[in-house]
């Protein structure tokens, strides 16, 4: 928007209008003319009149009748009559009398126009036609402008002085000047709760010359922008004009006390009105401890800081005036009870403008001024440092203590939300690190929930907006306080290596070969070769320039000087990281001497590594593997890569032996993740590996499924390494050798499963293994009988045991109830002490022939006593019953049974198709306790599964035995595509006939469908109950070998099973039964009979339609067909007689 400005004509006879983006400045005779950029809006009528008056007063040749103050665009003079001034005076709501108009030679119509309030012809069109201006239009204009007065401030601002100088005390982030008008200043007064004389900080009034004092005018100036301008008045101005100017001068410079409505302007230029009630609510809602004192009411006696609420005056830089400031103070004294607060710009504080301040009355306003002084001092220091200038000012903190004593406040040295000696935050619309770290003050209420950091101001809608990283020079030139991020927060950036701006190069790519200690170490000094992890923290660097020794303590000081917080970078923290950094760099120099040449272990590299670790751990909150485990944020069973840093033999007098479990071996090792370390206990097998030299210092281990002993609460790794009570429990099944270039810490990739033939039976839990399911056995039930005794039953027998157990319990309980009912009369006679009257009534009704008639004649009190006693009696009786039944059942051995279901699965190891060696897979049996329903139904024979949570059982058998819990183990099937990469392992179930039973090796499992020829009686043999069953399948009739057509099956149970339930009922004779999972035993050559054993996993089915025995369905049908033949009956009879002769029975009822 263009700016119009009045300038004197070159001839000096008049004035002219010009459009200028740069407004010239009035200066004294000794000061050259300067040009200032301005973005001031068009001058108001009050500005024009004030400019015209000042110019008229300055000119000596002005005539009383006409005043050539304005000129047209062509340079023609525009006559300004005194009657026009009177009209303008009436427009501005001034009191105009007829005498005034007469003195201005106004005509009668003009007097009428002035006297008339409805039409005031102030303006004219280009053709000379008058434009009437009504008072309603003026009221609308005043409502739009937000003020009912043209000028409403205690003093005239420089922009309104008529000298064409912009009052640009404030600047935006884009270096654009912000003009402050008198109305805006009045709104600021209303917003900040200031009084009438509180705006003298903006006046910068200088004493004028004697000529200006004669007429009561004073020059207006701003600091370092323009000098004082003296306005002279001609003493020979005739008539009432001099009186008018004198009266207007006082009216313009001393406006009324009415404050206009408060308005704000958005970045787009829109004006927003804010009522006093809204401002009051905002002040109560915000409650900002830093700027809240701006909104406090001075008349209420509130102060910025009180000893109860705030004690931090000592951390505010204060300068209570200086003799070299060059500012002139007002000598006026206010008559108010309280000295009002002075709102001061952060650029130029009032203590730098006034040389004399009454400290006794600055209870609240003085503290605010000192805040701004601190901001200005901080800015001056930053500017002087930028230009290389030295600043010899004294520290303002000393003055802060003195002023706090005068004001009666207690200085406070520390504030939780802000560091000491910190200036006020620069409230500009820039997002830099200084504002980003300006967190919420601790005195405010903390708000829960998600926190979003946004800029408090809108971005200016201009194309020249500069990002915070590109406008450091602009901030310095604007004079705003530049606050560095280290003064606002302890999270100062110490290292620029993180986040990495380019991909990191790891040791495998950098060195390219395995670390090997060469015999030639010309580049490695002796003191470097002697560095170990145990003494690396005591290593010191020798400064060649001096005799100083640089060790961990020196690096602690270096970090503190770099801005690190000693709360985080403590002595223990620095010593710990110094130890691992020195050891790592020394190993590089030792094992890669040709490439390193001793340039890795240097002071610069160590310091940079410490800064890098501080940046990641403190500023970014990253934690290493060991720190996360000790803090409880990650389980110790996670897969990670650690390095052996030391081997510590465990003595017999070790006091920490009790803290480790039985798996703790005679040797402990120290493991590190490069940042922290902790002890680890090895199991027996790992100890053997250590003694064999397969574990050594510097070796990396891939650990999975480790345990944690001695840990109860989150612990710091610096404390855990000292206490030695917490240790990792390592086992060989979860510990593998890692590659020399693997990164330390947690592993992101999935762990490789351990092969079944690599599992050690005493090597601890197996984190993960891959195997195929060869057989799934039926559900079994294990009952614990106490005293470490137990018995295993099949599902069929368990159901019978449950039925028999419940029958026995029911019979026993019925007997107890009958006996209890017979002894009921003697029971209640001894328990009538609770209610004598109720007991008597109860006995009476119990023996009465017609108790209903007796109850009808009872009073309500008697009925109530009877009911109460009866309820108590029945409750006690029920309790006695339950107790008596429980005791009787327990004595009879019929208490609650402790039965746990389980299932067994036979596994087989896998062999890759690419393997060229001998194929000898290892087999194992897994016992799943309390299997889930999904495991019972979804596990399938012949599939490959990824299994987790298996624990091996120590056994000398060639078969590996493992166990797992159904809820904690995981069975994930392998995809068919991946299963094709392994050699076949599964032989499907198929029925075996007696004719080819000789092809099966001994101790092998087989399934058969057979005809039951004879069922023997159960007998006891060596603490076992046995029962023999003889079967045939008819295959001998086709082969003609009658001698090999019998199979004797032995069923056995434990002797502790005192149940009378037999495995095979005699009723099964003559039926076709399917037997699964029978074990082949040696053949009875004497009697020419095949022998098999039914173990715990063996099961039989009468119905061939069962899912488990579906593969026997066809053979069962053939046997039934064969048994119905007439020729087969003689064969069956002959076989039965043969069985009786073998067992020694002459005759059997079942024959």
From Swiss-Prot:
Signal peptide: none
Record-linked SUPFAM superfamilies: BRCA2 helical domain (SSF81872), BRCA2 tower domain (SSF81878), Nucleic acid-binding proteins (SSF50249)
PROSITE patterns, per the entry: BRCA2_REPEAT
Region (Disordered): 408-427
UniProt repeat feature BRCA2, residue ranges: 63-97, 116-150, 163-197, 257-291
Biological-process GO terms, alphabetical: double-strand break repair via homologous recombination; meiotic cell cycle
Keyword Disulfide bond found: no
UniProt keyword terms in alphabetical order: Cell cycle, DNA damage, DNA recombination, DNA repair, DNA-binding, Meiosis, Repeat
Keyword hit for RNA-binding: no
GO molecular function, one term: DNA binding
Tissue-level expression: Expressed in flower buds.
Free-text disruption phenotype from the record: No visible phenotype under normal growth conditions, but the double mutants brca2a and brca2b are sterile due to aberrant chromosome aggregates, chromosomal fragmentation and missegregation during meiosis.
One Pfam family per UniProt: BRCA2
SUBUNIT field: Interacts with RAD51 and DMC1. Interacts with DSS1(I).
Biological role stated in the UniProt entry: Involved in double-strand break repair and/or homologous recombination by mediating RAD51- and DMC1-facilitated DNA repair. Plays an essential role in both somatic and meiotic homologous recombination. Is crucial for the formation of RAD51 and DMC1 foci during male meiotic homologous recombination in prophase I.
Name by which UniProt lists this protein: Protein BREAST CANCER SUSCEPTIBILITY 2 homolog A
Taxonomic path: Eukaryota, Viridiplantae, Streptophyta, Embryophyta, Tracheophyta
């Amino acid at each position: 928007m263009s700016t119009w400005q009045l300038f004197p004509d070159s001839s000096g006879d008049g004035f002219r209008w010009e459009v200028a983006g740069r407004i010239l400045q009035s200066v004294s005779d000794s000061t050259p003319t300067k040009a200032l950029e301005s973005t001031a809006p068009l001058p108001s009528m009050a500005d024009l009149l004030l400019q015209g008056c000042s110019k008229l007063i300055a000119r000596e040749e002005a005539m009383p009748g006409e005043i050539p103050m304005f000129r047209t665009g062509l340079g023609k003079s525009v006559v300004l009559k005194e009657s026009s001034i009177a009209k303008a005076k009436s427009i501005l709501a001034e009191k105009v009398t007829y005498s005034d108009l007469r003195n201005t030679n106004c005509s009668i119509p003009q007097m009428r126009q002035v006297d008339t309030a409805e039409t005031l012809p102030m303006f004219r069109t280009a053709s000379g036609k008058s434009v009437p201006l009504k008072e309603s239009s003026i009221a609308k204009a005043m409502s739009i402008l937000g003020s009912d007065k043209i000028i409403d401030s205690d003093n005239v601002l420089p922009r309104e002085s008529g000298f064409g100088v912009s009052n640009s005390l404030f600047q935006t982030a884009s270096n654009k000047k912000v003009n402050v008008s008198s109305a805006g200043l009045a709104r600021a007064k209303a917003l900040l709760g200031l009084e009438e004389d509180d705006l003298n900080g903006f006046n910068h009034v200088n004493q004028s010359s004697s000529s200006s004092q004669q007429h009561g005018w004073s020059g207006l100036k701003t600091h370092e922008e323009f000098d004082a301008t003296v306005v002279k008045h001609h003493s020979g101005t005739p008539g009432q004009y001099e009186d008018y100017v004198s009266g207007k001068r006082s009216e313009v410079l001393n406006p009324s006390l009415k404050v206009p409505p408060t308005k704000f302007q958005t970045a787009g230029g829109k004006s927003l009105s804010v009522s006093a009630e809204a401002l009051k609510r905002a002040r109560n809602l915000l409650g900002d401890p830093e700027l809240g004192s701006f909104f406090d009411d001075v008349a209420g006696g509130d102060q910025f800081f009180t000893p109860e609420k705030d004690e931090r005056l000592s951390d505010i830089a204060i300068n209570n005036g200086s003799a070299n400031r060059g500012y002139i103070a007002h000598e006026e004294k206010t008559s108010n009870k309280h000295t009002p607060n002075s709102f001061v710009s952060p650029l130029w504080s009032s203590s730098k403008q006034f040389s004399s301040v009454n400290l006794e009355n600055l209870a609240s306003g003085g503290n605010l001024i000192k805040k701004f002084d601190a901001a200005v001092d901080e800015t001056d220091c930053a500017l002087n440092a930028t230009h290389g200038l030295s600043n010899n000012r004294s520290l303002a903190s000393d003055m802060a203590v003195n002023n706090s004593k005068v004001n009666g406040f207690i200085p406070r040295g520390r504030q939780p939300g802000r560091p000491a000696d910190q200036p006020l935050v620069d409230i500009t619309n820039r997002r830099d690190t200084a504002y980003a770290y300006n967190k919420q003050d601790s005195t405010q209420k903390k708000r829960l929930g998600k926190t979003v950091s946004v800029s408090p101001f809108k971005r200016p809608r201009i194309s020249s907006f500069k990002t915070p990283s590109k406008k450091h020079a602009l901030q310095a030139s604007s004079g705003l306080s530049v606050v560095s991020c280290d003064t606002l927060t302890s999270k100062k950036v110490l290292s620029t290596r993180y986040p990495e701006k380019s991909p990191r190069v790891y040791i495998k790519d950098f060195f390219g070969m395995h670390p090997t200690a060469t015999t030639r170490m010309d580049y490695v000094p002796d003191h470097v070769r002697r560095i170990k992890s145990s003494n690396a923290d005591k290593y010191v660097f020798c400064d060649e320039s001096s005799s100083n020794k640089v060790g961990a303590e020196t690096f602690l000081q270096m970090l503190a000087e770099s801005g690190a917080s000693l709360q985080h970078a403590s002595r223990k923290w620095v010593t710990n990281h110094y130890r691992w950094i020195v050891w790592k760099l020394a190993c590089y120099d030792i094992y890669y001497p040709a490439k390193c040449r001793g340039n890795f272990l240097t002071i610069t590299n160590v310091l940079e590594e410490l800064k890098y670790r501080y940046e990641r751990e403190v500023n970014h909150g990253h934690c290493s593997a060991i720190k996360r485990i000790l803090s409880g944020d990650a389980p110790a069973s996670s897969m990670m890569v650690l390095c052996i840093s030391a081997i510590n033999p465990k003595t017999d007098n070790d006091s920490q032996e009790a803290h480790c479990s039985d798996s703790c071996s005679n040797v402990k090792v120290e493991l590190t993740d490069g940042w922290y370390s902790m002890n680890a206990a090895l199991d027996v097998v790992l100890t053997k590996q250590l003694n064999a030299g397969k574990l050594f210092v510097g070796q990396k281990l891939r650990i999975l499924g480790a345990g944690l002993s001695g840990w109860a609460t989150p612990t710091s790794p610096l404390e855990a390494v000292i206490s030695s009570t917490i240790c990792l429990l390592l086992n060989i099944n979860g510990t593998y050798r890692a590659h020399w270039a693997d990164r330390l810490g947690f592993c992101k990739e999935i762990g490789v499963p351990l092969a079944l033939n690599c599992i050690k039976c005493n090597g601890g839990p197996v984190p993960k293994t891959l195997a195929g399911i060869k057989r799934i056995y039926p559900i079994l039930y294990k009952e614990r009988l106490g005293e470490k005794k137990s018995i295993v039953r099949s599902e069929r027998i368990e159901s019978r045991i449950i039925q028999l157990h419940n029958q026995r319990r029911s019979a026993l309980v019925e007997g107890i109830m009958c006996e209890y009912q017979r002894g009921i009369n003697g029971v209640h006679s001894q328990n009538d002490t609770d209610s004598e009257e109720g007991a008597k009534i109860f006995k009476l009704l119990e023996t009465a022939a017609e108790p209903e008639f007796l109850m009808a004649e009872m009073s309500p009190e008697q009925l109530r006593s009877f009911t109460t006693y009866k309820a108590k009696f029945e409750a006690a009786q029920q309790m006695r019953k339950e107790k008596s039944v429980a005791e009787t059942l327990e004595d009879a051995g019929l208490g609650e049974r402790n039965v746990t279901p389980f299932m067994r699965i036979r596994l087989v190891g896998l062999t890759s198709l690419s393997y060229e060696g001998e194929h000898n897979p290892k087999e194992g049996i897994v016992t799943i306790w309390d299997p889930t329903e999904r495991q019972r139904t979804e596990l399938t024979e012949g599939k490959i599964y990824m299994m987790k949570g298996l624990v091996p059982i120590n056994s000398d058998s060639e078969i590996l035995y493992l166990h797992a819990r159904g809820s904690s183990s995981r069975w994930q099937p392998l995809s068919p595509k991946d299963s094709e990469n392994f050699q076949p392992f599964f032989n499907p179930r198929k029925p075996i006939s007696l004719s080819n039973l000789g092809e099966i090796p001994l101790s092998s499992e087989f399934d058969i469908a057979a005809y039951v020829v004879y069922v023997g009686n159960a007998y006891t043999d060596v603490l076992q109950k046995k029962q023999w069953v003889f079967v045939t399948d008819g295959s001998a009739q086709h082969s003609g070998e009658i001698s090999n057509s019998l199979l004797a099956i032995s069923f056995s149970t434990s002797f502790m099973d005192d149940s009378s339930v037999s495995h095979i009922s005699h009723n099964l004779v003559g039926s076709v039964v399917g037997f699964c999972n029978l074990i082949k035993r040696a053949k009875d050559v004497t009697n020419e009979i095949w022998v098999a054993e039914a173990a715990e996993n063996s099961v039989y089915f009468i119905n061939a339609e069962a899912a488990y025995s579906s593969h026997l369905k066809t053979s069962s049908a053939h046997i039934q067909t064969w048994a119905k033949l007439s020729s087969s009956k003689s064969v069956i009879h002959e076989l039965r007689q043969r069985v009786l002769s073998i067992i020694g029975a002459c005759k059997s009822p079942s024959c």
